[in-house]
A protein has these predicted regions:
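Catalytic loop of short-chain dehydrogenase/reductase
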Residues: 1-6, 11-56, 66-71
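C-terminal helical subdomain
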Residues: 57-60, 64-111
Length: 111
């Protein structure tokens, strides 16, 4: 759970009112075959985001960006038949919203 450790260690270095933006994916809410551990990890990060938003000190915020499979990640398309594909630029916009906005504890889902 490297992202959790990043937050735990980073609290001491992030400015007051700063923001952590983590990343998960579609597997947290719509898993595929042979991806049980990945689905578990995605769900755990999303739950961590919700809980940490309550406890983070000094106005520090935390959000997670959670896209479906990317249009540009063509090697993954066969594993996600029927899934809506999202553009990388849309994922980037979600990061901007997280970092520049004021919300905390959000899961920005791009399906």
């Amino acid at each position: 759970m490297g992202q959790v450790e990043l937050v735990r260690a980073g609290i001491n270095y992030l400015s007051d009112g700063g923001c952590f933006t983590l990343m998960t994916g579609i597997l947290a809410r719509d898993p595929i075959a042979s991806a049980t551990v990945a689905a578990f990890a995605n769900g755990a990060i999303e739950s961590f985001t919700l809980a940490a938003a309550i406890d983070l000190p000094r106005g520090i915020r935390i959000n997670t960006v959670s896209p479906s499979v990317l249009v540009e990640a063509t090697s993954y398309h066969p594993s996600f038949p029927g899934y809506h594909q999202v553009k990388a630029v849309d994922v980037a916009d979600a990061y901007v919203k997280s970092i520049m906005g004021k919300q905390s504890g959000q899961i920005y889902k791009l399906d």
